Amino acid sequence: MAAPGEALTPSSYITHHLTNLSTYKLGLVAEESSFWNVHIDSLFFSVLTGLIFLGVFRAVARKATAGVPGKLQCAVEMVVEFVDKNVKDTFHGRNPLIAPLALTIFCWVFLMNLMDLVPIDFLPYPAQHWLGIPYLKVVPSADVNITMAMALGVFALMIYYSIKVKGLGGFAKELALHPFNHWIMIPFNLLIEVVSLLAKPLSLGMRLFGNMFAGEVVFILCAAMLPWYLQWMGSLPWAIFHILVILIQSFVFMMLTIVYMSMAHEDNDH
């Protein structure tokens, strides 16, 4: 990495902005592939956005009034009603935790995605030159570790509720006797169902990561290839379009979570 004050080439600029601040980069672990190589910046901003979500909703809940609501209360109520409607339309089981889960996922993923609209050097530049932090990626959802961790969390809940609702035997029967209800087809059924099951968290996490990482790369390319006084010409049109991507990806992650929870609560044959 270039020292403070040293100009970066476009190639090194792009590489620098795609590098996480990790325990490996800080010399705390010996290998980059180590299990303990934590992406500190992704973890920090994911926790920060989560705390912002909790803080805003808690503040609104405490100050909620039956009279004329403020703008923030109206916005929060619109989000809650939007999520609640989608849960009622999609989830047909009985579980009071699904709506709060969907609300948390939608708002948290949205806030993490929203970090992609922060100007590329707005935080990394002062972090490097004033605080001595060599690398800083501010978009948690552009880190595959974060998106896959969330997807695996949803997957764990899916398995838990599948076994809880259907029983261990019912869950095993679902894997072994579908789509072909004959004992001789059990190996083939297991292969299909296990692959299908494992594909759910993989596609859930990689879809969000791929879209947000691609968006981040476009912003970095605009900043690397254009002089500073022309960067807005490339970044602004993409930022306007990217707002849709941010919303859509938050919605898709939430809806797939609801669908997976609904599938886990189905106590009947396909």
From Swiss-Prot:
> Which family does the record assign?
Belongs to the ATPase A chain family.
User: How does the record describe its quaternary structure?
Assistant: F-type ATPases have 2 components, CF(1) - the catalytic core - and CF(0) - the membrane proton channel. CF(1) has five subunits: alpha(3), beta(3), gamma(1), delta(1), epsilon(1). CF(0) has three main subunits: a(1), b(2) and c(9-12). The alpha and beta chains form an alternating ring which encloses part of the gamma chain. CF(1) is attached to CF(0) by a central stalk formed by the gamma and epsilon chains, while a peripheral stalk is formed by the delta and b chains.
Q: Which organism is it from?
A: Vibrio cholerae serotype O1 (strain ATCC 39315 / El Tor Inaba N16961)
From the record, give the transmembrane residue ranges.
Answer: 37-57, 98-118, 143-163, 208-228, 239-259
Q: What is this protein called?
A: ATP synthase subunit a
Q: Name one Pfam family in it.
A: ATP-synt_A
Quick one: which gene encodes this? atpB
Q: Source taxonomy lineage?
A: Bacteria, Pseudomonadati, Pseudomonadota, Gammaproteobacteria, Vibrionales
Subcellular location(s): the record lists:
Cell inner membrane
Q: Which CDD domains match?
A: ATP-synt_Fo_a_6
Query: Per its record, what are the GO molecular function terms?
Result: proton-transporting ATP synthase activity, rotational mechanism
List UniProt keywords, sorted A-Z.
ATP synthesis, Cell inner membrane, Cell membrane, CF(0), Hydrogen ion transport, Ion transport, Membrane, Transmembrane, Transmembrane helix, Transport
Presence of keyword Transport: yes
Q: Tell me a GO cellular component.
A: plasma membrane
Q: What does this protein do?
A: Key component of the proton channel; it plays a direct role in the translocation of protons across the membrane.
